[in-house]
UniProtKB/Swiss-Prot annotation:
SUPFAM superfamilies: Translation proteins SH3-like domain (SSF50104)
Family affiliation: Belongs to the bacterial ribosomal protein bL19 family.
Function description: This protein is located at the 30S-50S ribosomal subunit interface and may play a role in the structure and function of the aminoacyl-tRNA binding site.
One GO CC term, this protein: cytosolic large ribosomal subunit
Alphabetical list of PANTHER family matching this protein: LARGE RIBOSOMAL SUBUNIT PROTEIN BL19M, RIBOSOMAL PROTEIN L19
Protein's UniProt keywords contain Ion transport: no
Keywords, ordered alphabetically: Ribonucleoprotein, Ribosomal protein
Keyword Ribonucleoprotein: yes
Protein name: Large ribosomal subunit protein bL19
Provenance organism: Pseudomonas putida (strain ATCC 47054 / DSM 6125 / CFBP 8728 / NCIMB 11950 / KT2440)
GO biological process terms, semicolon-separated: translation
Superkingdom in the source lineage: Bacteria
InterPro entries, sorted: Ribosomal_bL19, Ribosomal_bL19_CS, Ribosomal_bL19_sf, Translation_prot_SH3-like_sf
GO molecular function: structural constituent of ribosome
Length: 116
């Protein structure tokens, strides 16, 4: 009985429209940032290196290079802190987890664009 109630509550919270994306895709995540009294949106653009599909507990990791330093951020897919998610380009990769990109730099870390 409680399992059905939990599933119903999770389904209500998962009502947000999320575009389909996969590891290797370049995405722009608009994150709500609260600084004192005021709130603003902060864009985080990078390559999705991992995706975890667990219903309401789904998450994805985005990696970008900011002034020569690699920055990774993990987002909860259905978090209220995420305002919007946009896919900028589709990447053509053969693995589900792209952790090997952490060791690569420059042109070696590029990902081919998916043609179709």
């Amino acid at each position: 009985m409680t399992n059905k109630i939990i599933q119903q509550l999770e389904a209500e919270q998962m009502s947000k429209e999320i575009p389909t994306f996969a590891p290797g895709d370049t995405v722009v995540v608009q994150v709500k940032v609260k600084e004192g009294e005021r709130s603003r949106l902060q864009a985080f653009e990078g390559v999705v290196i991992a995706k975890r599909n667990r219903g309401l507990n789904s998450a994805f990791t985005v990696r970008k290079i900011s002034s020569g330093v690699g920055v990774e951020r993990t987002f909860q897919t259905y978090s209220p802190q995420i305002d919007s998610l946009a896919v900028k380009r589709r990447g053509d990769v053969r693995k589900a987890k792209l952790y090997y990109l952490r060791d690569l730099s420059g042109k070696a870390a590029r990902i081919k664009e998916k043609l179709s």
